[in-house]
Design a protein with these regions (language model features):
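Membrane-embedded beta-strand positions of outer-membrane beta-barrel proteins
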Residues: 29-31, 69-73, 106, 121-123, ...
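Outer-membrane beta-barrel "beta-signal"
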Residues: 30, 207-222
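Transmembrane beta-barrel domains of outer membrane proteins
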Residues: 56-60, 107-111, 171-175, 218-220
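Repeated loop/turn-to-beta-strand initiation elements of outer-membrane beta-barrel proteins
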Residues: 65-67, 116-119, 178-182
């Protein structure tokens, strides 16, 4: 948490001293696929495939056509399933633990040169606000994975997802004429997605953080 706050403070300080060209902001749309999982949460545990899509802004930093801020507002599917490749036929294999967010990442984006078509890298924080949680087919022996179920034996244990979480994202991509862009990203979850599972019987107190690998395609308007 301290590292995250320090990184955010440094980013804000850097931005405050940079020449940000809000008047030259361009807007665009973005869509892609997510491959997500949650560490230390469910058993069995496997990946979930989901969708993301929304809008973005490209805000110049400095006079060169090379460095930008790219905030986004997207629908962002994450969570996981029970489809562990080594758990076929096991109770809970068909479970779904879907978390759907309104997500707001803020990337620092740098193209490798000022050329019209060029590779780029990006990094920055991501803030997720839970819109809905869809859970089904939980293991019979772990009914508390269902956020609507309260086990009288373990009243403090539940599978409710946090209303808010955050992480750090990195990515690399290619831009065709600074309009059509393809990118691969990885979001490292930092906060605890399922604090109610920290006291799970025979579970772990390690943070249940979401990790998301995604591929996105965006179009930026002139």
């Amino acid at each position: 948490m301290k590292k995250f706050l320090l990184a955010s403070a440094l980013a804000v300080s850097a931005i405050s001293f940079a020449q940000i060209g809000f008047s030259s902001t361009r807007f665009g749309i973005i869509a892609g696929g997510n491959y997500s999982g949650v560490k230390n949460a469910h058993n069995p545990s496997g990946p979930r495939f989901a969708f993301q899509g929304g809008v973005l802004a490209l805000i110049p930093i400095g006079s060169e056509n090379q460095f930008f801020l790219q905030p986004e507002v997207t629908y962002y599917g994450a969570g996981e399933t029970g489809k562990d490749k080594d758990a076929k036929g096991v109770d809970g294999y068909n479970a779904v633990y879907a978390n759907n967010y309104l997500s707001v990442p803020i990337y620092f984006k740098g193209y490798f040169s000022e050329a019209a078509s060029e590779f780029f890298g990006m990094a920055g924080p991501r803030f997720n606000f839970l819109m809905s949680q869809n859970v089904k087919n939980v293991p019979v022996i772990r009914p508390y994975y269902d956020p609507d179920f309260q086990d009288p034996l373990y009243p403090n244990v539940n599978g409710k997802a946090s209303k808010f979480n955050f992480g750090l994202g990195i990515g690399i991509g290619y831009s065709y004429k600074r309009q059509l862009e393809l990118a691969a990203r990885y979001d490292f979850g930092i906060s605890n997605t399922y604090p109610g599972l920290d006291k799970e019987p025979k579970g772990t107190t390690k943070s249940k953080s979401e990790q998301v690998l995604s591929v996105t395609l965006s179009y930026i308007f002139n």
